[in-house]
């Protein structure tokens, strides 16, 4: 039987990151609508595609959770939907925080607590999040 995550910091980190990925998905869906209304079809499509990828990230995290109630304390962007330019900046900043700070830290904690599969998941998703940031920055620099 696999080691339980119940009561660990890894369990809290999984729920925190699941919530973050879920919220990012919704923000990107909103941002896609703004981009489309502003005439940026390609950017709208990228926001939509990235939203779908964030959904898959959230699903990978959710599958490691074991049920029950888990209390977390976390800070999340409290929702301004701006112009496409502002939304690209906000999205790039969020992705940067995930791949450069949050997920490497969560991977290290998972490793220390004896959850190598969860650590690997965070490291793999970090690579994707870096790609998301780079894509958003490419639009900003165009």
Model region roles, listed by residue range:
Residues 1-142:
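Non-heme di-metal
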């Amino acid at each position: 039987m696999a080691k339980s995550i119940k009561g660990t910091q890894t369990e809290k980190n999984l729920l925190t990151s699941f919530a973050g990925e879920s919220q990012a998905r919704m923000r990107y869906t909103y941002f896609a609508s703004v981009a489309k209304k502003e005439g940026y079809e390609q950017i709208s499509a990228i926001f939509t595609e990235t939203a779908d990828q964030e959904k898959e990230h959230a699903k990978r995290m959710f599958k490691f959770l074991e049920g029950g109630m888990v209390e977390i304390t976390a800070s999340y962007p409290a929702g301004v939907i701006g112009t496409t330019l502002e939304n690209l900046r906000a999205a790039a900043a969020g992705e940067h925080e995930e791949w450069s700070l949050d997920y490497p830290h969560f991977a290290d904690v998972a490793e220390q607590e004896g959850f190598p599969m969860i650590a690997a998941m965070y490291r793999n998703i970090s690579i994707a999040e870096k790609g998301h940031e780079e894509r958003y920055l490419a639009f900003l620099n165009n």
